[in-house]
Amino acid sequence: MQRIGKYDIIRRLGRGGMGAVYKALVPEIDKVVAIKLLQPGELLETMVGLEQLEAIFLFEARTMAAFNQPFLVTAHDFDRDHQGRPFFVMEYICNNLGEMIGETFTLEEPSRIIAAEKVLGYGRQILRALDFLHHHRIIHRDIKPQNILVTDEDTLKICDFGMALVQGVSFSGPDNMQVGSPYYTPPEQRKQPQSVDGRADLYSVAVLLYRMLTGQLPGMQS
């Protein structure tokens, strides 16, 4: 069985520009966790540099480790694998809103519609999480369905803080790094990603709620 540090890998859950997320097991206590491992793509590593990417990754882990809020995913361990690549450990949650609504990679395809009452409850949870983040001067900058995990009890938890900006902190990623996801990102964030405030996250939430209610993205023809 493949291992990352002391953790037994069960399977890979997904992969992004900076790395991969795995479902893993703590063998001593038979507990399932999620592991995010820094595995940047060649293009991103060339553009940004491995040292800078490791700094961003550590910044994400430290930010998540400081959370104590029911609607945010918390990091609770950090280490390096046998190749020296950094990883951090989080609670494992098997579902996300992207899977729930059936959002495809191309985004243009209509998604499943969720009942308005449930969307209202989801919206409250997301906004409570953002209220906590913004109170601590943290701007997520990548709110989208795939970054909202859904527990078996229907509790939402925001994850993936690799693009987060902490206002007043000198380091929050390089200026030349593209931040956010198509359709969910406000225009000002695409132009000046280091200058946005909490309103950028609220824009993304509005798009997300619209998507769940209508199955469409703003500007898409029905």
What spans do the regions from the language model cover?
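Conserved short submotifs of the Hanks-type protein kinase catalytic core
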Residues: 83-96, 100
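Protein kinase catalytic-loop region centered on the HRD/HxD motif
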Residues: 128-138
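A short, aromatic-enriched beta-strand patch in the conserved N-lobe beta-sheet
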Residues: 77-79
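Conserved N-lobe ATP-binding subsite of Hanks-type protein kinase domains
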Residues: 20
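AlphaC helix of the eukaryotic protein kinase fold
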Residues: 42-66
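Activation segment signature within eukaryotic-like protein kinase domains
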Residues: 122-123
